[in-house]
Regions:
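Mature catalytic domains of secreted/periplasmic carbohydrate-active enzymes
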Residues: 1-189
């Protein structure tokens, strides 16, 4: 399986995952990262804000399962990246997994994790709101995974555009609700 889906493939308990979280970001340096991005001529920096395992890489109010509360680092790396990107004129973009395996049964074998209304209203919308209101202009929201309904896909794209009209949304918000099309994993289009 995919290493980024190991929590589901190997049924790793969340408590075991948290043991590893303590040492996250020990050598994190937002200034050096953004300088490298800038000096290499890249126009934007895309960072994973939350992957399928549900661990948030920012100071979210929706769960204590985040880098600020669970790591020795204790700071918000998204805030630091936002500050450094702005200093250098680099655009910031977020990858955001629609699914959250702390809130639903993992289905790693296919993209069929249904999104229930509770997840939409208590996790997805509040987390998107935090990401799009606490870190300045966001160039792109890269959604991934999940099996939302067409109506849910439209709502997620709408939430993004209501908060930041210029933010691009990729096609992995599903159901033709994105602003541009992307290919599949491990494929060339």
């Amino acid at each position: 399986g995919y290493p980024e889906q190991i929590k589901a493939w190997e049924n790793i308990p969340t408590d075991d995952y948290l043991l590893k979280a303590k040492d996250l970001a020990a050598n994190f340096d937002a200034s050096a990262i953004c300088k490298t991005v800038h000096d290499s001529g890249m126009k934007y920096l895309m960072i994973t804000s939350k992957h399928h395992d549900g661990f948030a890489m920012w100071d979210t109010k929706t769960t204590d399962y985040n880098i600020v509360k669970q790591s020795n680092y204790g700071k918000d790396p998204m805030k630091e990246l936002s500050t450094e990107c702005n200093k250098l004129g680099v655009k910031l973009a977020f990858y955001f997994s629609i699914i959250d395996w702390t809130k639903q049964t993992p289905e790693p074998y296919g993209n069929v994790n249904p999104i229930d209304e509770d997840l939409m209203t208590t996790v997805i919308k509040p987390q998107l709101t935090e990401l799009l209101t606490n870190y300045g202009p966001i160039a792109e929201l890269w959604f991934d995974m999940g099996g939302p309904t067409a109506e849910q896909s439209q709502r997620m794209a709408q939430w993004v555009h209501e908060l930041q009209p210029e933010t691009m949304v990729n096609s992995r918000v599903w159901n033709k609700a994105g602003d541009f099309e992307v290919g599949g994993d491990n494929s060339v289009t």
